[in-house]
Design a protein with these regions (language model features):
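Conserved "landmark" site that anchors the functional core of diverse proteins
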Residues: 1-150
């Protein structure tokens, strides 16, 4: 699966349920803020319960799909659109190569989630794919997604 980040949004990171067992070494658990929305996003795609997703805060990303995949969008209502047309939340959505996913401002909530049937190809660090920005580990290069990431 391939996605190109056209706009990173305010704070878009890769997250799962986080890493436990390393707090005594100074690492926070990290992980998703809204566990229910995270689990529903993965359930809709028949993914493993702890499969990594994109979590975004207040302003969602703009993503271009460079290959076909199936996604689900959960969490707050950020008025998602695919190619300029409203997209449904809390359902599986087939994305074609070249499709553009955008979000408006939040109508409800502060966080949204995008799960992928073809999984996010990021390394597992200490048992988790979650981004820990302070420690610069996990997720995509240990940081939030930025414009033009691929």
């Amino acid at each position: 699966m391939g996605i190109r980040v056209l706009k990173g949004g305010m704070m878009t990171t890769v997250q799962d349920l986080g890493r436990t067992g390393y707090q005594s070494q100074g690492f926070s658990v990290s992980g998703v803020m809204d566990v229910r929305s995270f689990k529903i996003a993965n359930l809709l795609l028949d993914n493993p319960e702890n499969e990594a997703v994109l979590e975004f805060t207040l302003i969602g990303p703009t993503l271009e799909f460079t290959s076909e995949t199936i996604i689900s969008i959960t969490g707050g209502d950020f008025r998602p659109q695919i190619n300029g047309k409203p997209a449904k939340m809390y359902t599986a959505i087939y994305m074609h190569r070249g499709d553009i996913l955008t979000f408006g401002g939040a109508r409800t909530g502060t966080r949204g989630y995008i799960a992928f049937s073809s999984y996010l190809d990021v390394p597992v660090v200490m048992g988790s794919r979650s981004t820990n920005i302070k420690c610069q580990i996990g997720g995509y290069k240990g940081r939030k997604l930025e414009d033009e990431d691929y």
